[in-house]
Amino acid sequence: MDLRTPKGTHDYGPRECYLLNRFLRAVTEVFETHGAACIDTPTFELRELLCNKYGDESRLIFDLADQGGDICSLRYDLTVSFARFLAKHRVQRLKRFQIGKVFRRDQPSVSKGRLREFVQCDLDIAGAYMEMVADAEAICIMSECLDRVGHRYQIRISSRKILNALMEHSGIGRNNFATVCSTIDKMDRLPWADIAAELRTKGLVDGQVAVLKRYVCVSGGIEVIDTLRSGELYLYSDGKKGIDDLALLFKYLGIYGVGDRAVVDLSLARGLDYYTGVIFEAALVDFKDVGSVAGGGRYDNLVSSVLGKKSEWSVPCVGFSLGVTRILSVMLKVDRRRTTETEVFVGSSGGLLLEERMGVLSRLWRAGVAAETFYTRKYGYASLMEHVRKTDIPFFLLVGEKEIAENRFRLMYGEDRALQMYGDIDTIVNFIKSHRAGQRPPAGL
């Protein structure tokens, strides 16, 4: 029997799951700090819901076989499902997060975290608020999540409204906006010559390509906004609105303390049809080959489009997705070797002492300390220590007949577990908890 996983999918072993779950716990804490609530939606949706939402990316949707009844497809992202949720339940204001698998019929690259099945983690703010307030908080939350990754990153920010003005200024018909944006969005991974060639295949002439190049190659800080305000795009209504939005957004990002991590980059287009305003994307500075690890933007019309063309009920939204699988691919390259949350390994000396170790484990567990031992035959001290080092368990507690008789156990910790302290179980628990909290050990230890 062929035991391969299908192309573009991946098994997650203990180490992968440990790192993945640790990161998801960290970002969930960030979301909840900002008052977000969790929801969940089906893994597959009615096919008609997903149609015409993703531009050129629609070809990547996995369609399920027609078995009679509903015609369904696997979800491409979590955003369209969220819009359906808002529309179905008539929710007008909600700050929500959701974690789940999504599916794309893409050409996979496991080494770069590009798969056909992968985990996404979304945060969205739905509702009408003052200009750019929700957008700024969404980018702030995304920044706080990326802080948990522990590597340098940069956030690129653009605006669909500015891009609309650029298309109009370039003489590009509105029916070509989406496909041209999809090509421009590849600039972070393709040279300009390839971008220009692809634009020409979509019907653009050399003059139009030249105008696009003059703007989409612009990148920088607040000075770019000042330059745009004095340029041709500011004369268009969409251009003026988009540029003024960016100016206000960067003001708010400065207040939140994340403005220094963001740049204006008009090559950022994000190829999805539903974006209407600010768009943003983040990449790890030292792992550019992985691609973007987070991205999102404002989508004010998606909920009404889900309800149908005649609907007047709408909910403006802004949000982002974390590319969890791509982030995991980076963590696997550089992170330490832990596979569990175990804090203490309980070993024995001078005998098997299984029941005695079980008693110690029980007390540690009840005290809220993650601990484990071997339930098989007796292992030598060297083998136990090798296991502790290999799995990066920070503490090694030794149980022997003398320790049991005196109720005084030896705890080894630090580099190569070379440091030691002695005490009863309560004292050891307090020491471990103080170490966990980054505090100085209690006096006398």
Curated annotation (Swiss-Prot):
Similarity comment: family membership: Belongs to the class-II aminoacyl-tRNA synthetase family.
Pfam families to which the protein is assigned, alphabetical: tRNA-synt_His
Sample GO molecular function, one term: ATP binding
Record-level GO cellular component terms: cytosol; mitochondrion
Keywords attached to this entry: Aminoacyl-tRNA synthetase, ATP-binding, Cytoplasm, Ligase, Nucleotide-binding, Protein biosynthesis
Species annotation: Antonospora locustae (Microsporidian parasite)
GO biological process terms held by the UniProt record: histidyl-tRNA aminoacylation; mitochondrial translation
CDD domains referenced in this protein's UniProt entry, alphabetically: HisRS-like_core
InterPro entries the UniProt entry points to: aa-tRNA-synth_II, aa-tRNA-synth_II/BPL/LPL, Anticodon-bd_dom_sf, HisRS-like_core, HisRS/HisZ
Enzyme Commission number, as recorded: 6.1.1.21
Catalytic reaction equation(s): tRNA(His) + L-histidine + ATP = L-histidyl-tRNA(His) + AMP + diphosphate + H(+)
Keyword ATP-binding tagged: yes
Localisation per UniProt entry: Cytoplasm
Name this polypeptide is given: Probable histidine--tRNA ligase, cytoplasmic
Gene3D superfamilies in alphabetical order: Anticodon-binding domain, Bira Bifunctional Protein, Domain 2
Domain of life: Eukaryota
Principal location listed in the UniProt entry: cytoplasm
